[in-house]
A protein has these predicted regions:
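Conserved catalytic submotifs in the C-terminal HATPase_c
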Residues: 110-120
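Hydrophobic residues in the alpha-helical elements that line and stabilize the ATP-binding pocket
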Residues: 71, 135
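Short beta-to-alpha transition helix within the HATPase_c
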Residues: 88-104
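Acidic ATP/Mg2+-coordinating residue in the GHKL
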Residues: 170
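Short conserved segment of the HATPase_c
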Residues: 175-187
Length: 192
């Protein structure tokens, strides 16, 4: 009887924690969608009134939008298997969308972007956009500071067998060998 009551108590506590976690995730998703409205308004205002000040505001606004997107994706990570929508995706359009979204960030950091992706692939478009965006942000963040190096990010595809490889290449500083085992840790930042 004692074990049964103890198990019941533990199960009730687990359900309560799961409910709290779901409520928190719902709150985060709601907050992200609410904050996107002013982000879009700022973006439109900056595009309609171009000068040095609005260009800088637009850059910072883009950083905020990228961080907000990251919050949303991390909030959804636990239920990622429910969030997949596998469909035929134009990889060139996806890569171009990321470069266009971040064009001011790329330009202000002197990074040239190039896309050569004539292929289609079956993938989840939201997640491939998120991954490409993170790789692009890291390419800029870890670009070479050597003035003789002209930073670039090159996104292209290669066919192999019946599949397609999506390759993201840059000429940045790279990740040190001793840090490679940590690259998939949440929040990992490599040393410069």
């Amino acid at each position: 009887e004692l074990i049964r009551r103890s198990n019941k108590s533990v199960i009730e506590r687990i359900r309560m924690l799961e409910d709290e976690q779901n409520d928190y995730r719902d709150y985060i998703e709601s907050w992200v969608h609410e904050i996107k409205a002013p982000i879009t308004s700022i973006q439109l205002a900056c595009e309609n009134h171009k000068d040095e000040v609005t260009r800088q505001i637009g850059l910072e606004n883009q950083r905020i939008e990228n961080d907000v997107d990251m919050v949303l994706y991390y909030a959804r990570m636990e239920k990622v298997y429910k969030d997949y929508m596998i469909e035929e995706t134009d990889l060139g359009k996806a890569a171009s969308e990321i470069l266009i979204k971040n064009k001011y960030y790329l330009i202000s950091n002197g990074v040239r972007g190039e896309v050569e992706c004539p292929d289609l692939a079956y993938t989840d478009k939201k997640w491939i956009l998120f991954i490409l965006n993170q790789l692009m942000l890291n390419s800029v963040k870890y670009k070479s500071e050597n003035p003789k190096v002209h930073p670039y990010i090159h996104i292209y595809t290669e066919r192999y067998g019946h599949g397609v490889r999506l390759i993201v290449e840059d000429n940045g500083t790279g990740i040190r060998e001793e840090e490679m085992s940590r690259i998939f840790e949440k929040g990992f930042t490599c040393l410069l």
